Amino acid sequence: YEVERVLIEEVDSARAKGGMAVVMDTYTGDVLALANVEGAVADVPAHSAPADSRNRVLTDAYQPGSTAKVITIAGALEEGLVNPNSVFHVADSLKVGDHVFSDNEKHAPVDWTVTDILAESSNVGTITIAKSLGKTRLDSYLRTFGFGVKTEIGFPGEASGILLDPKRWDSTSIGTVPIGTAIGVTVLQMLNVYATIANGGVWRQPRIVAATVDAEGVRTDMPTSATRRVISTSTARQLNDMLREVVKRGTGTRAVVPGYSIAGKTGTARKPLEGRRGYSNDYMASFVGFAPAERPRLAVAVVLDDPGTEIYGGVVAAPGFARIMQAALRLERVAPSTITSDLPLKKATATLTR
């Protein structure tokens, strides 16, 4: 109920057509809460479930945008091509094939570390790293992280998403795919990428039912979720630290939760036109992350469909993430961080009474 209530308020505040949110236990893979709502601007009753009763978190594929950049970075780290402090000379645009890719904000050529590239959500920097990784290895990491296949969570109509075989990529695909366009994922698939990082690099199959209780009150626990290692513990730890920087000083500063360290990433992507090539002027805005970063317990994804106020995930989706994460941490009684939270420090004075 709390997740849906917050999502409704955030969808209304952003004047979005709708929204989706999921909360997952990173230890078990259990989905603790999920919500799908329609906004007041949609051509359906406000705050209703989707008109055709789809659970969009599981059944609808969307282009994730920059939340998917973490997979390119993960692959490059795992292959030993870069480390978090590797420096790249990054311009604000780069031609790949017949398309020019640009960063969201114009800037002079700058020397950025890989951590900076992720924190600033640089398209050019990410594509540069992806080109060194190569399409075959990039595709392998996308699939190992769970893209292109169903999670097999057991929900009817679950989508597998859209991920073309590298043999079918065109000359611009090494630019589009690494930054989360020209692919389609469900919200659950995207959330599970971050849960995998939180879980030390081990992918765990999501579970929506932990146990059943029969008419006589006998409880039967469901089998433990299947697992597989995707990246090393060392790579996962590096990504954890880098994703914290996104929230501390990058595009995700509005995702801060007082008292807790947050790791996560913003995402913004234009929606494809229906039934034909090209893109509309509508956007999907998102934030996906986990907490407490030093001892992850919960992962949360918030996605807003075509927000009418601002388009960027760091502006319109991150605040909803923070509210839902804060509520989930409280309800699950997760202890505050043992290290400094991501709130800026303020000077204060105090008088001692003897």
Describe each PLM feature range:
Residues A335-L345:
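Short, flexible loop/turn segments with low-complexity composition
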Residues Y1-G19:
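Conserved, well-ordered alpha-helix/loop/beta-strand core segments that scaffold catalytic motifs
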Residues P307-V316:
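A short acidic/glycine-rich loop-to-helix N-cap element
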